[in-house]
Curated annotation (Swiss-Prot):
F-type ATPases have 2 components, F(1) - the catalytic core - and F(0) - the membrane proton channel. F(1) has five subunits: alpha(3), beta(3), gamma(1), delta(1), epsilon(1). CF(0) has four main subunits: a(1), b(1), b'(1) and c(10-14). The alpha and beta chains form an alternating ring which encloses part of the gamma chain. F(1) is attached to F(0) by a central stalk formed by the gamma and epsilon chains, while a peripheral stalk is formed by the delta, b and b' chains. It holds the Pfam family OSCP. It comes from Synechococcus sp. (strain CC9902). It is found in: Cellular thylakoid membrane. PANTHER family: ATP SYNTHASE DELTA CHAIN. Keywords: ATP synthesis, CF(1), Hydrogen ion transport, Ion transport, Membrane, Thylakoid, Transport. It is a peripheral membrane protein. F(1)F(0) ATP synthase produces ATP from ADP in the presence of a proton or sodium gradient. F-type ATPases consist of two structural domains, F(1) containing the extramembraneous catalytic core and F(0) containing the membrane proton channel, linked together by a central stalk and a peripheral stalk. During catalysis, ATP synthesis in the catalytic domain of F(1) is coupled via a rotary mechanism of the central stalk subunits to proton translocation. This protein is part of the stalk that links CF(0) to CF(1). It either transmits conformational changes from CF(0) to CF(1) or is implicated in proton conduction. Belongs to the ATPase delta chain family. The keyword Metal-binding does not apply. One of its GO terms (molecular function) is proton-transporting ATP synthase activity, rotational mechanism. One of its GO terms (cellular component) is plasma membrane-derived thylakoid membrane. This is ATP synthase subunit delta.
């Protein structure tokens, strides 16, 4: 992954500089999150964009047709540059690196929350308040994901701190306690 990060950083830094100059960093950060969601959920889109068979011009045309109305010109230009340079395989790394740099610049803490089932709006709001209290700031970006292996409950990762309130975690801790007792 370090090689991919070293490839992604210059693109992400350039995008951050351009979006800062145009006062659209927050908008582009939200668009990056949406694009990452599409990238993760659509294998067809992802496979087409990283395919060595498709010409860069075809990829650019597809990106323009699909995303022109959904993203800012700055972000569209970056996507076209990645297509031109055959770097769309680094798309996810570039978007994630941009989001890291944006959060760092804005003083936003990232909290990753994995839950056994999708959380309701009320649960998300309550969890958000708890995470903000844990982080000691109201500037918290919560990344929610569903992990059925947790069986029940959730796991919050906030920097190097991990709070495991999952059923799978409780079973694991119980097993360790029983192993020590015997």
């Amino acid at each position: 992954m370090p090689l991919l990060n070293s490839l992604a950083t210059p693109y992400a830094e350039a995008l951050l500089q351009v979006t800062e100059a145009r006062s659209e960093s927050q908008t582009v950060a939200e668009q990056c999150k949406q694009l990452l969601s599409v990238w993760d959920s659509s294998a067809e889109f992802r496979d087409a964009m990283v395919s060595p068979v498709l010409e860069p011009s075809s990829k650019k045309k597809a990106l323009q047709g699909l995303l022109a109305e959904q993203v800012t010109p700055s972000l569209m230009n970056l996507l076209k540059v990645l297509a031109d340079r055959q770097r769309l395989q680094a798309f996810e790394a570039v978007m994630n690196r941009f989001l890291e740099l944006y959060r760092e610049q804005q003083g936003i803490t990232l909290a990753q929350v994995r839950s056994a089932k999708p959380l309701s709006e009320a649960q998300q709001a309550a969890l958000s308040k708890k995470v903000q209290a844990m982080a000691g700031t109201s500037k918290v970006d919560i990344d929610l994901s569903v992990d059925p292996a947790l069986i029940g409950g959730f796991v919050v990762s906030l920097g190097s701190q991990v709070i495991d309130a999952s059923l799978a975690g409780q079973v694991r801790r119980l097993g360790l306690a029983l192993a020590k007792a015997s």
